[in-house]
Amino acid sequence: MKTRFAVSALLFALLILPGCSTNPAPANSNTGQPAATAAADPLPSWNDGAAKKAIVDFVKSTTDKSSPNFVTAEDRIATFDQDGTTWVEQPMYSQFLFVFDRIAELAPQHPDWKTKMPYKAVLSGDKAAIAKLSIKDMLALFNETSTGMTPDAFQGVVRDWMAKAKHPRFDRPYPEMVYQPMLEVMKYLRDNGYRTYIVTGGGQDFVRAYAQQVYGIPPDQIIGSTVETKFEMSKGGRGTLIKQPKIQLDDNFSGKAEDINLFIGKRAHIAFGNSTGDQQMLEYTSPASGVTLGLLVLHDDATREYAYGPAQGLPDSRVGTFTQALYDEAKARGWIVISMKNDWKQIFSWQK
């Protein structure tokens, strides 16, 4: 996501694109990790090709003690953008859908919202009116969904929403809108000693609410945009944090590199993104000592998912923009461009 929770992108988005073994494998003497069965394919949802080979070669090279590219266990860090990289971001970011649904849910407690902007625009579903809202108006909507809440309470509301919300096109719960090939990559990396981090422009507490369930990634390995919190003592004498209506961290563009340093303190050796909002994260990965790998997902499969760029002549989009300039930089830097159409045998676990 881009630009302070990608609020400006919303104005455009509203008008576009309507059984397991119980015996552990023996340890590999070179890597210290469990040895995989020779015939096992760690990435079964990937077609054989340059992208799959690059990932497998990278993992083998960086986990083999005899390799000059060996990366010690403490430095095995992998970063993933979320929206458009690990799950669907079209026709609009999932957090926007959450905000709109939350405003509608809270509306009975605020009768004045029916006639008060920006709430009136959302409640009436007036796309033209929403398109005219200022960034200040949009931030007011976002703040209404979390201000005054503890992080735990907010995450509880998000989990409740996730349990019932469905994607508008595929009519599937959002936890099922994750890309199966990316889940396989995450597991493959973790099986080989890598720590996997989500580095997203979305709300940090929003993603923390479901990341363990969806990705197998714990809350402390989620980096995202945040609002300020204020420490207070509860009536029961317990210290707590209360969300405030002010942006603290904007985890987009260069903010991703800055926050990786802030939260992790080390550069990643492998990074995955899909848009201009991820460019600096990949650029920050590239100078790491030893071998590194940057990968970008190109959405070029309108049949199984969506097609947008505008790189390579694909339709333009303000949601997850992948420009030709970014595509050209990827080629110049040796980053791998993952074609959804050609590199992914299967996109969703339920989709054949």
Please place each PLM-identified region on the residue numbering:
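Short, solvent-exposed loop/turn and secondary-structure capping segments
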Residues: 89-92, 97-100, 209-211, 284
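C-terminal motif of bacterial Sec signal peptides marking the signal peptidase cleavage site
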Residues: 16-19
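N-terminal carbohydrate-binding/catalytic regions of secreted carbohydrate-active enzymes
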Residues: 58-77, 90-91
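Nucleotide/phosphate-binding catalytic cleft detector across ATP-hydrolyzing
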Residues: 12
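A metal-dependent, Asp-based hydrolase signature
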Residues: 92, 97-176, 180
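C-terminal cap/substrate-recognition subdomain and adjoining C-terminal extension
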Residues: 24-44, 50-56, 60, 75, ...
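Asp-based phosphoryl-transfer active-site loop
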Residues: 76-91, 282
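Bacterial N-terminal signal peptides that target proteins for export
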Residues: 1-9
